[in-house]
């Protein structure tokens, strides 16, 4: 089963790229011209129209706003969103994004611009990357254009490509957060060896992130003792982070230290009583030692905390399955896929149906997960939830297909990191 331990790259990216101030929020009303005030009124009207999903009207307001103030970065971002929603011209969409990225803006405004990138189709993304490549050549010493390209690639789950662009940014300026992103992206690309090398390069000012990433990667590699030491390091650095104890609990389970795992999951709950996966995993540990009353209590608590599908993942389907409520497990999974049809959701669905013994649906959802970008191929082949399909010829065909795709993605990564700014 997929665990949700990845970095929130967009949020961190925007915090470390704070390159200006948002005009509509930080400029005093008395410091604006009448024209700028009118531009902001149109912008605010556009926001209201967008909330009503009237994107055509919002587009008209934003165009009027930009006529009055052509330096209004947030207006370009929202105009691009409106064009996406109304199936506007691809060239116009990507041009507006570039204009928004070129202008000085706050972290909040930058987040708006980057969020638009994540709404693009593959074709729109390719055009945006082409335009970002032009900006990279024009401003070869500005790391931000490579970082923007990384986010564009990440929006299409092109993990190798995103890692390559972040590496280009690091070559300009050794930003430790970008180095952490590289390690995390290479992990998601399924290349644990390169991911570990990247994690080891993270500077001492991010010692916690370095240790946490190493723990996750080493666990994926099956180096459980080393992974355990890495989680111990995380806890020594900051004893109040629930995720460190959760990761250590998962590792102790692999090492058959069930009592130790229970203690760690209990610590997670002490630190964060809303951590639903900790209740589920502790319930699993109680079940392994035959304490079914405690297990059921934890399962029910996990369900109480996971009443609706969430983008960051749900323990609920697996809890229902542990309680023997197969129909509810399936129904909840279906609701997740309806609302959040991303690669992680499909991978979890494949695991659920693997546990249910439904080979056809397990393979179908695994194929969907891979199609949407899931690339941890070695993990897939050793995941106990997928044992039921791992010997099927169709499974081997799918893995071979995406191994070839992954190899091509790796070649693209090498091409990016070895290219010159003038190329």
Describe each model-derived feature in a short phrase.
Residues 65, 99-100, 134-135, 168-169, ...:
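Canonical positions in the second alpha-helix
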